[in-house]
Amino acid sequence: MPKLKTKSGAKKRFKVTGTGKVVSAHAGKRHGMIKRTKKQIRQLRGTRTLFKTDGDNIKQYFLPNA
């Protein structure tokens, strides 16, 4: 049976760390920031770690070779 292909959209959005956790960028920072406070915008910087169950699903279905 051939290897499963990685979903190309997922490999642009998620990264698997060395310990196996899945990280992604925060959502909600593309447009409409005029409504948000400076603190809210600042807290959307960087990456976030997904919950274990969500990360396991991402690795199983979208990033099978990671």
Swiss-Prot record:
UniProt keyword Ribonucleoprotein present: yes
Pfam family, one: Ribosomal_L35p
The keyword Ribosomal protein is assigned to this record: yes
Keyword terms of this UniProt record: Ribonucleoprotein, Ribosomal protein
GO biological process, one term: translation
PANTHER family: 54S RIBOSOMAL PROTEIN BL35M, LARGE RIBOSOMAL SUBUNIT PROTEIN BL35M
Family: Belongs to the bacterial ribosomal protein bL35 family.
NCBIfam families: rpmI_bact (TIGR00001)
Entries under HAMAP family matching the protein: Ribosomal_bL35
Protein name in the entry: Large ribosomal subunit protein bL35
Species name: Afipia carboxidovorans (strain ATCC 49405 / DSM 1227 / KCTC 32145 / OM5) (Oligotropha carboxidovorans)
